[in-house]
A protein has these predicted regions:
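A structural micro-motif
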Residues: 22, 60, 91, 109-111
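Acidic, PIN/NYN-like endoribonuclease modules and their adjacent C-terminal/linker elements
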Residues: 98-129
Length: 129
């Protein structure tokens, strides 16, 4: 969520999302966490606007993660992102959270995690046109 701040060096990634350059997958649990974080860091109005953008954008996919893999043990709350990625058949999760490192040792289901800076590099090198 840090990329939505205009002053953030990776704001161009949010602009890319708004332009439809990549797909964002989410579950209800993920939206609830985003709302909580955005309300703490900004205010309720901004949180509502951002969530509305995410849920209404044509390049988002709402996922019903009806099974919980429970792959991350150090911070089980992070599993909502893993479950979403598995059911969405996502290419990867973008996160700098150290708890996702546990996934490197799990063969099935295989979930790739890349850091925000790596995603920014990949995004810069993709010809969107």
């Amino acid at each position: 969520m840090q990329i939505i701040a205009r002053k953030n060096k990776n704001y161009f990634l949010w602009e890319g999302f708004l332009n439809g350059d990549y797909c964002l997958c989410y579950t209800t649990e993920i939206l609830e966490e985003y709302e909580e974080i955005l309300c703490l860091k900004t205010n309720r109005l901004i949180a509502t606007i951002v969530l509305e953008i995410i849920t209404q954008a044509p390049n988002t996919k709402r996922i019903d993660a009806h099974y919980h893999w429970n792959l991350i043990t150090q911070d089980p709350d992070d599993n909502k992102f893993v479950d979403c990625a598995v059911f969405a058949n996502a290419d990867f999760i973008v996160s700098d959270d150290k708890h996702f490192k546990e996934l490197e040792n799990i063969d099935f289901p295989r979930v790739l995690v890349i850091k925000l800076e790596e995603f920014a590099r990949l995004y810069r090198n993709i010809d969107i046109n």
